[in-house]
Amino acid sequence: MPSTWLAPAKINLFLHINKRRKDNYHNLQTIFQLLDYCDKLTCTITNNGVIKRTSGNKSVKQDQDLIIKAAKALQQYTGTTLGANLSIVKNIPIGGGLGGGSSDAATTLVALNQLWDTKLTQAQLMKLGLNLGADVPVFIFAQSAWAEGIGNILSPIKTPDHYFLVVFINKHISTKEIFSHYALTISEPQGKIANFSELVNTHNDCLQVAIKLEAEIGVALEHLNTCYNRVGQARMSGTGSCVFNEFLTEKDALAAAKKVPKKWMSFVTRAINNSPIYNWAVAKR
């Protein structure tokens, strides 16, 4: 019987790059804010051990799809003889800095761990997920979080029940190109914050490089900064190319959305502190 699971988007409320590591990753500090804007994964368990994608983004080859990689990683790690047919409905823009691929992989791991009854703990799933991508663990953690390390050292954080207008300029920014760019800003690490209200002097160290690579990001930010009733300045999520405004009410966010140029994709979404997969994740801690 098919089982359907949600994979939420995230935004980075800020992103400070602290240090380039010997493994070519970067130490960073950020807040991952989960959103109620989701991809939808449907799993059908099989007895033949075969893992395949039955529908989804055809522009991504099956063997390169993170949901397939995640399923095969869990299968190999646990030794299960079960298989799965996986179908994904993509809503989260690809290559926009919203973590869609990582979230899909995380939901795949959590879902199949439950459906295959492989009994891995959340910590084990997070370790397995880290091999698939630095952002995968936070989606298995299943809570909005203060993050350090390469984004894998996580502490839950409660954020306000605000709304966001997210704009995707329909252009992909290469994370690898951002982090290898000569102009990437490095910030001094801040002390760990105890609550959201302690955020001061935050920014996104990737922003100026992203604008150098794709000037339209700057244009989108300028547009968002003309919106009424926004909370603070418009920001970029992750390494881009999505930018966003924060609002106290859905009404204000929807009013701003009506003025977004039609050439860009946009959506209004709400901040959530717990992921839709939170209950399954905590059951396996």
Curated annotation (Swiss-Prot):
EC number from the UniProt entry: 2.7.1.148
Lineage: superkingdom: Bacteria
EC top class named in words: transferase
Gene3D superfamilies in alphabetical order: 3.30.230.10, GHMP kinase, C-terminal domain
The keyword Nucleotide-binding appears for this protein: yes
Known pathway: Isoprenoid biosynthesis; isopentenyl diphosphate biosynthesis via DXP pathway; isopentenyl diphosphate from 1-deoxy-D-xylulose 5-phosphate: step 3/6
Residues reported in the UniProt entry to bind ATP: 93-103
Protein's GO biological process: isopentenyl diphosphate biosynthetic process, methylerythritol 4-phosphate pathway; terpenoid biosynthetic process
GO molecular function, one term: ATP binding
Record field: catalytic activity: 4-CDP-2-C-methyl-D-erythritol + ATP = 4-CDP-2-C-methyl-D-erythritol 2-phosphate + ADP + H(+)
Residue ranges of coiled coil: none
Catalytic residue list: 10, 135
UniProtKB keywords: ATP-binding, Isoprene biosynthesis, Kinase, Nucleotide-binding, Transferase
PANTHER family given in the database record: 4-DIPHOSPHOCYTIDYL-2-C-METHYL-D-ERYTHRITOL KINASE, CHLOROPLASTIC
Entries under HAMAP family matching the protein: IspE (MF_00061)
Family affiliation: Belongs to the GHMP kinase family. IspE subfamily.
Function according to Swiss-Prot or TrEMBL: Catalyzes the phosphorylation of the position 2 hydroxy group of 4-diphosphocytidyl-2C-methyl-D-erythritol.
Protein name: 4-diphosphocytidyl-2-C-methyl-D-erythritol kinase
Lineage start: Bacteria, Pseudomonadati, Pseudomonadota, Gammaproteobacteria, Candidatus Pseudothioglobaceae
